[in-house]
Regions:
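Signature of alpha-helical transmembrane segments and their immediate interfacial
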Residues: 1-32, 383-384, 388-438
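Alpha-helical transmembrane helix bundles of large polytopic membrane transport and channel proteins
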Residues: 22-23, 76-187, 497-575
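Solvent-exposed, non-transmembrane loop/terminal regulatory segments of multi-pass membrane proteins
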Residues: 23-69, 168-176, 411-414, 432-474, ...
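Extracytoplasmic
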Residues: 146-262, 266, 554-644
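Hydrophobic transmembrane alpha-helices and their membrane-interface caps
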Residues: 270-316, 657-702, 734
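Pore- and gate-forming transmembrane helices of large, multi-pass membrane proteins
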Residues: 274, 324-355, 711-740
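Transmembrane alpha-helices and their membrane-interface boundaries in multi-pass membrane transporters
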Residues: 290, 306-322, 335, 339-343, ...
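Juxtamembrane segments of multi-pass membrane proteins
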Residues: 414-538
């Protein structure tokens, strides 16, 4: 191709990449909901787990502590932070131990008489009002006077204070200066976010809002704000993963460039060989944006990792070029084998699509499209752009010696049997369980952070994130009624110290029938005014001071019962909304549990309710979900393996040749499993993903080592290309193996071991007839 035509082709290719980049920039919406990478639930508990793992009330809680100043200063900071956060629509509840006059939306204040349990045992008559007013008189001479002055005219019986106490955590920390403190002299706060716990992006915004509000407070410069909770953990994990992936990516990229420059001594070839990889990435993302409304961030991260297979295509072309030979001639000779490798890798990645998990389906689409684009652009576009004059790598002195050493290696036929026996022994002697079902074991969070969370959770009486009490009824009101009926049994369990506290939906909203019953006990305006006038006799209050109270009671008499829908318009009602779930024609109520000491007692509570109440162990549900997930992936892998055998056998037209390709790949895969298990590593889903990637790389090695042209120079070129591929893979994944993030470490270690084992076994099990040079 003439120089002008080459420049035109390069410009068209670059314009196509720019167009793909524009499409991606316009359409790409990145999702951070981790549930996209979980399988579809099959049991009621799994469905509830998936719904509540990020949206449940416990997952939305942020635990805050402020330290580093005097108690008085910390109390002031606590009050200032709470005041700044309460009007913010990103938070549904902010608690710090102080009385919250605004806990109920102002428009809902008259409902306090329907929400409070006072009228269940005490009528609003003269005797009760007189007793309450005398108590308020005493209160006005106490330190609480400043708080009560604004409240007294509208609420002389302090129903709002009673509700605030009811809605506070059952196990509240010590109060100092009117706010919560820990035994370590930290001011404590509980904040519930609107954002789901497993939405790191929205949680980051909520956390940023808290930190900005805190740093804007006077006197905050010398104090330290610490956060904890599921949402905070999701943000920390995401930040740690990005940080480690970024620095590993930078170092490995620099190393990869240096490796290619050392291998080919051509900067132009290096730049041009990047075009198929860039095309693969942009085309894969563009197709994702067309096929899916949102693309998960993990899909992009894993997808770029899996596209590491595609970097081998231009490397093979560069290494196999002969001096004076046109690049088109080189690629034509390689294409049948490259096409087999591409098709085989695509079949392996189809296992992700067959898993049925949305995140893995995205991963399959991304990688398969990317591999096809990288492969075909390497075949039909790249050769026209490569420099015409190249150095034949087969003439390198070190490579001649390396190939001679490889040729002299013993290749006894019993190697496969020996490796298989070693695998069996290692698997038999491996300690601990084979599979890792506990997702918590994959957390990269430091122990100190987890201990800090446990300490704050205990001090604040925050709900347990493992257990939920699930109530089931045919209607929403049925759930609230069941919740109310269950309360005496819960109180008995608390008295027996089986549990510290259980927060039920009726805790926030009584059923309609209970509200109507209380409403009927409210006196009419004339009766209330008469009783109030009598109660005021002899007390120093103005006669008209309590007219707002009289008006609220009159308003409450005519109010329709408060429903969850209307309640949800207030911040506190959004907390109730998180505790009520409609599914499959019935309603569920979710009770959060704090300080569970006797699991059996709570399970017995469920057994006595004819199935309407049950204790949900989210850990057990997640483990069953992971096991089901793994089963589906393994089934998909089995089908993909069978297709792979058929594809390789068809492409090579020989069972013997197929054996030389598939046997080392299979043995190397199981050898990685055996070594990791012998080291005590439990196999997780991420190890399976890494094994598939390593298998795709190993398939390339075996295919090209099996290709015996009878030409020693071509054998050296094959060895050169494979060594460059192996070193580049070890560079990237070896770095990942040193990461502190368990997921990254699992992928890095597994692929690094896989690359090493695949390379060695592909050489030792390749057909070998040494051809002497003339």
């Amino acid at each position: 191709m003439r120089m002008g035509a080459r420049i035109t082709l390069l410009m068209i290719w670059l314009l196509a990449l720019a167009a793909l980049g524009w499409v991606v920039s316009q359409r790409l919406k990145v999702s951070t909901d981790l549930r996209s990478f979980m399988p579809a639930p099959t049991t009621p508990d799994q469905r509830l787990l998936m719904e509540q793992v990020g949206d449940g009330p416990g997952s939305r809680l942020l635990l805050l502590s402020i330290a580093g100043r005097s108690d008085a200063q910390l109390a002031a900071l606590s009050r200032g932070l709470a005041a700044a956060l309460k009007p913010d629509r990103r938070y549904t509840q902010v608690l710090n131990g102080s009385f919250d006059l605004g806990a109920l939306d102002p428009s809902l204040l008259p409902y306090r008489y329907l929400l409070s349990s006072t009228l269940d045992t005490q009528p609003l008559d003269e005797a009760y009002l007189a007793d309450q007013l005398e108590q308020r008189l005493d209160d006005l001479s106490s330190p609480a006077a400043s708080m009560l002055k604004g409240l007294l005219p509208r609420d002389p019986t302090l129903e709002m204070l009673k509700l605030a106490e009811r809605w506070a955590p059952a196990k509240s920390p010590q109060l100092r200066d009117g706010v919560w403190f820990s035994p370590r002299h930290e001011a404590l706060l509980l904040v519930q976010t609107v954002a789901a716990g497993f939405d790191p992006g929205a949680q980051q915004q909520a956390i940023d809002g808290i930190e900005q509000a805190f740093h804007a407070l006077p006197g905050s410069s010398g104090a330290k704000l610490d956060l904890s909770g599921p949402g905070y953990f999701s943000v920390v994990i995401g930040a740690q993963t990005r940080h480690q992936a970024d620095w590993i990516g930078r170092i490995s990229t620099i190393g990869f460039i240096a490796l290619l420059l050392l291998a080919y001594r051509s900067f132009s070839s290096l730049l041009l060989s990047a075009l198929p990889i860039a095309s693969a990435a942009l085309a894969g993302i563009a197709v994702l944006t067309l096929a899916f409304p949102e693309v998960h961030g993990i899909t992009l991260a894993f997808g770029f990792t899996l596209l590491g297979v595609a970097q081998e295509y231009p490397i093979r072309v560069l290494s196999h070029r002969r001096a004076g030979e046109d690049a088109l001639q080189s690629v034509r000779a390689l294409w049948p084998l490259l096409l087999t490798a591409i098709a085989s890798a695509c079949i392996a990645y189809l296992a992700f699509y067959a898993s049925g998990v949305n995140g893995l389906k995205q991963l399959a689409v991304f990688t398969i499209v990317g591999l096809l684009v990288a492969g075909f652009s390497t075949r039909y576009l790249l050769p026209h752009l490569l420099p015409r004059r190249v150095r034949d790598v087969a003439e390198m002195g070190w490579l001649i010696k390396a190939r001679d050493w490889v040729d002299r290696l013993p290749r006894p036929r019993w190697i496969p049997a020996l490796v298989a026996l070693a695998i069996a022994l290692m698997l038999a002697l491996a300690p601990g369980p084979f599979w890792q079902n506990n997702l918590a074991a994959l957390t990269p969070l430091p122990t100190a952070m987890l201990q800090h969370d446990a300490r704050l959770r205990d001090a604040l009486g925050a709900p347990d994130v493992r257990y939920l009490l699930v109530l089931q009824a045919s209607t929403e009101q049925g759930v609230l009624a069941l919740s109310e009926q269950l309360q005496p049994q819960i109180d008995a369990l608390i008295a027996k110290h089986a549990v510290d506290a259980v927060e039920l939906p009726s805790h926030y909203l009584p059923p309609t029938a209970r509200q109507q019953e209380r409403q009927q006990k409210l006196p009419d305006r004339a009766t209330l005014q008469q009783d109030l006038d009598a109660a005021l006799q002899g007390l120093p209050f103005r006669a008209d001071l309590f007219q707002p109270f009289v008006q609220d009671v009159e308003t409450a008499r005519a109010l329709p019962p408060l429903t969850p829908e209307k309640y949800a318009q207030s911040p506190l009602g959004q907390r109730l909304a998180a505790m009520l779930v409609q599914r499959d024609g019935h309603w569920l109520g979710l009770g959060t549990i704090s300080g569970i000491h006797d699991v059996a007692a709570l399970q017995a509570l469920g057994a006595s309710s004819h199935g309407n109440v049950r204790l949900l162990d989210l850990k057990a549900a997640s483990e069953s979900l992971v096991a089901a997930y793994r089963t589906r992936i393994l089934q998909a892998l089995l089908i993909a393996s069978l297709l792979l055998v058929l594809t390789i056998s068809f492409a090579l037209r020989s069972a013997r040749r197929a054996w030389h390709v598939l046997a080392p790949m299979t043995l190397a895969t199981f050898l990685v499993l055996a070594v990791e298990r012998l080291a005590g590593i439990e196999i997780s889903l991420f190890h399976l993903v890494a094994l598939i990637l390593a298998g795709g790389l190993g398939l390339h090695y075996a295919l090209f080592f099996e290709r015996d042209t009878g030409d020693p120079a071509e054998q050296r070129r094959t060895l050169h290309a494979t060594i460059v591929c192996v070193l580049s893979a070890l560079l990237v994944f070896g770095m990942l193996a040193w990461a502190t993030i368990p997921v990254l470490r699992a992928i890095g270690l597994t692929v690094s071991l896989g690359v090493a084992f695949h390379f060695c076994l592909s050489i030792l099990m390749a057909p070998h007839t040494h051809v002497a040079e003339d």
